[in-house]
Amino acid sequence: MSLQKSKTRFGAVVMKRWSRKLNRIIARTAAVFLAFLAIFAYNTNNAKAESVNVSAASAIVLEASTGRVLYEKNAYEKMPMASTTKVMTALVALDYGNLNDVVTVSKNASGVEGSSIWLSAGEKMTLSDMLYGLMLASGNDAAVAIAEHVGGSLDGFVELMNKKAQEIGAYNTHFANPNGLPAEGHYTTAFDLALICARAMQNENFCEIVKTQYKTLPWEGHEWDRVVKNKNKILWNYEGGNGIKTGYTKEAGKCLTAAAQRDSMQLVSVVLSAPDMFNDCMALMDYGFENYKNRVIMEAGEYIGDVTVEDGTEDRFSVYTDKDIMYPLTDTEYEQIKRRVHLEEKVKAPVSMGQLVGTIDLWLGENRLYSVELKAAYQIGKNSYEFNLNRLLKFWMNGRMLDM
């Protein structure tokens, strides 16, 4: 063997030994915060069997951010929903329309029966103002004008409504019009409608509209403006009330979707065919706030474990959570939360940013609440001769400087 080859081989052995030592030193301080994705399946099995005194034929209250059902009564029975339909009308309009668009009222829209904001054929109004007229005063004329503008036609808009219902998971809902007037094939369930409302309450523009008590709207051809008042008494009469929509037809009876937020918990309640609809929704939300709290079941910065890296520029990295996970629980349930961690013991370099390295499942009894994906927050490269040489030189230089 030549002298040059011998030196090269000796250098490689030294590099490898020093590299292992350096990897161990560096790994003691290397910590990777992992991005995680919480996958939540709607859980309706834990709704309390206790009775809440409501007049409604169908009722439900759920926590909006998780979709957890806190109480329900006949919540999966298909029923007409009157003007609570307009929650979906507004949501679709916000998804597909532009708030600054100018809507021209058709003769068809101006002639719709029932509650209205007194639109005239040919009148022009921004989509934003039209939505206030829809959700505060429950204008059937506004519903048709919005639908024709955003969907191109009533049929086109209704198709978008039904598509959105499927996206949300409201599988037992079907719309036949944008205003909720009686029609064949127009129905929902209290559960589905609560899901729709929960989704709508995630939209900032929607929330701003439905929490408004009074709104002044322009009125073409008149010396004064329209002033519309929100029909939802929850805004005045219930602590934290912040939405959302009333409804009534002879066929559907009195219907109400109501929302309230206290601290970090946003509740949505729905009652269908409810003679005492406001008191019903307040009783449902009272039950939710009195029995449940939105609790942190996994905190940001919690240490989960270590993952070994084979042939990497680092020997291992530590796994931490990077955000809080909250869930509505009773005091008793909070003590029953269990975790099941599934973490890779070893991964081979290179490690890509976002690479899946494990999961955490959070359980309440036999119900899995969340499955959290643990992903590498940054890249870890593959070991190489050049990398080891550079690290050895830096380590050697640092050592010499300390000796000086």
Where are these regions (language model features)?
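Active-site-adjacent loops and short helices of periplasmic peptidoglycan-processing enzymes
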Residues: 3-5, 16, 41-204, 208-209, ...
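Generic hydrophobic-segment detector
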Residues: 21, 25-31, 53, 57, ...
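Domain-terminus/edge residues, biased toward the C-terminal soluble/receptor-binding domains
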Residues: 170-171, 182-187, 191-404
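N-terminal secretory signal peptides that target proteins for export/translocation
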Residues: 1-23
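Short linear motifs in intrinsically disordered/low-complexity regions
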Residues: 1, 20, 24, 44-47, ...
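Sec-dependent N-terminal signal peptides of Gram-positive bacterial secreted proteins and lipoproteins
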Residues: 23-46
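Structural motif marking the loop-to-transmembrane transition
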Residues: 18-26, 127, 385
